[in-house]
Amino acid sequence: MTDPVTGLTALDVEIFDPPLCCPTGLCGPVLDTTLVDLGEAIISLQAAGRTVVRHMMTADPQAFLRNREVYQLIRERQLAALPITVVRGQIVKTDAYATLDEMRVALEAGLVPASAP
């Protein structure tokens, strides 16, 4: 799918992370199982040939500005909107990480999970 405004091909999955202590978020003294599950989901999708990119606000702020819908959500709800999961250019989940099943449904069936804005 090509973005009509930018002319760029949409990535399969983009994850816009809240501020984390490191790129994976797995660097603190307490292990966050949600982030472990996310890491496993990303590995699974990539093994299936999907392109998955995570954007951290501190490391890649331009990504948050380039995506108009993501930028608008952050302006409206600030950091409470994060994390945001985008599948093929469409927001499919906010406030929590999408599960592997939710991302697969959005990718394979073209359906958007009910929790989308």
Predicted feature descriptions by range:
Residues 55-79:
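Thioredoxin-like thiol-disulfide oxidoreductase module
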Residues 87-114:
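Non-catalytic, surface beta->alpha helical segment in thiol-disulfide oxidoreductase systems
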Residues 3-48:
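Local sequence-structure signature of Cys/Sec-based thiol-disulfide redox active-site neighborhoods
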Residues 1-6, 114-117:
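Basic/polar N-terminal segments that are highly enriched at the extreme N-terminus
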Residues 34-37, 41, 66, 70, ...:
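Amphipathic alpha-helical interface surfaces
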Residues 51:
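Residue-level detector of anion-binding/catalytic polar loops
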Residues 77-91:
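Extended, charge-rich low-complexity interaction segments
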Residues 20-22, 60, 92:
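Short, catalytically relevant binding-site loops at active-site mouths
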